[in-house]
From Swiss-Prot:
Plants silencing QQT1 exhibit severe defects in growth and development, such as severely arrested stem growth, small size, formation of serrated leaves and abnormal structures of the shoot apical meristems. It is an enzyme of class 3 (hydrolase). This is GPN-loop GTPase QQT1. Disruption phenotype: Embryonic lethality due to embryo development arrest at the octant stage. Belongs to the GPN-loop GTPase family. PANTHER family: GPN-LOOP GTPASE 2, XPA-BINDING PROTEIN 1-RELATED. Its EC number is 3.6.5.-. GO terms for cellular component: microtubule; nucleus; phragmoplast; spindle. Heterodimer with QQT2. Small GTPase that is essential for the correct formation of the tangential divisions in early embryos. Associates with microtubule during mitosis and may function in the positioning of the division plane. May participate in the patterning of the early embryo at the octant-dermatogen transition. Is crucial for normal development of the plant. GO terms for biological process: cell division; chloroplast organization; developmental process; embryo development ending in seed dormancy; shoot apical meristem development. It comes from Arabidopsis thaliana (Mouse-ear cress).
Length: 298
């Protein structure tokens, strides 16, 4: 049984930086980590790859040969990977004995909530290699500063969760920079817990662009609340406590926390519940740490 993370998110959300930082953190914890780069457009990697899709196919070659743009080229690459899944399986098998796997995916979001190739690749790997994976979706925290962008990020997160069908952790990345993006309309816990979205209506009406689609946005918010699946944790990749809290969540979601444990059902339950870590207190501490200067200016 092999554990790992599927790192996804829009362009610029910090996926490659996350993989690099998470790899270093887990290595310090004593885990052997292998990063699998499945982004054929990422040719400036800050980490050493265990597997690199560029050995199979390159985006620039696809664009040149088939006269495709970047998005069409990435879709082609994922379809090509799906058809050549044996190549990826053969590359992963030597790592299965003792490695924790990080999959670094492209940032084109349509690959994760519309197109099926990425989902099919992961499904085949999970079945053939007995993988236990958690999808970690990174959302840049600056999107919280704009109500319309925040609702869009919620809709993206929900759509991806439903489409990928994996244990899922949504992350507001770059939380250390949130104080520089501008003042939030509400406390940070409003955005992490996805509280009553009707409170956003007033702020949406202040923006002429959002006001035009006010009714549509209201209906989308209703869909998000009806499913009640989306919430966020926060991440400062340079802060070991922040990364450690995220690792705990991921380990619970993919079952790593139970690996190698021979215990009764009662003991498993104790481990699963663990020591109570109140989200409100944790998020309040994050707000105080990273948004203190903004509050002083007020």
């Amino acid at each position: 049984m092999v554990f790992g993370q599927v790192v996804i998110g829009p362009p610029g959300s910090g996926k490659t930086t996350y993989c690099n930082g998470m790899s270093q953190f887990l290595s310090l914890m004593g885990r052997k980590v292998a990063i699998v780069n499945l982004d054929p457009a990422n040719d400036a990697l800050p980490y050493e790859c265990g597997v690199n899709i560029e050995e199979l196919i390159k985006l620039e070659d696809v664009m040149s040969e088939h006269s495709l743009g970047p998005n069409g080229g990435l879709v082609y690459c994922m379809e090509y990977l799906e058809k050549n899944i044996d190549w990826l399986e053969s590359k992963l098998k030597p790592l299965l004995k003792d490695h924790y796997i990080l999959f670094d995916f492209p940032g084109q979001v349509e690959l994760f909530f519309i197109h099926d190739s990425t989902k099919n690749v992961l499904t085949k790997l999970i079945k053939s290699l007995n993988l236990r994976l958690t999808a970690v979706q990174l959302i840049d925290s600056h999107l919280c500063c704009d109500p319309g962008n925040y609702v869009s990020s919620l809709l993206l997160s929900l759509s991806t969760m439903l489409h990928m069908e994996l244990p899922h952790v949504n992350v507001l990345s770059k939380i250390d920079l949130i104080g520089s993006y501008g003042k939030l309309a509400f406390n940070l816990d409003f955005y992490t817990d996805v509280q009553d979205l009707s409170y956003l209506e007033h702020h949406l009406s202040q923006d002429p662009r959002s006001a035009k689609y006010r009714k549509l946005t209201k209906e989308l918010c209703s869909v998000i609340e009806d499913y009640s699946l989306v919430n966020f944790t926060t991440l400062d990749i340079q802060d070991k406590e922040s990364v450690g809290d995220l690792v705990k969540l991921i380990d619970k979601s993919n079952g790593y926390i139970f690996a190698g444990i021979d215990a009764s059902v009662v003991e498993y339950s104790k481990i699963a519940i663990g020591q109570t870590d109140w989200d409100y207190n944790r998020v309040a501490a994050v707000q105080e740490k990273y948004m203190e200067d903004e509050e002083i200016q007020d």
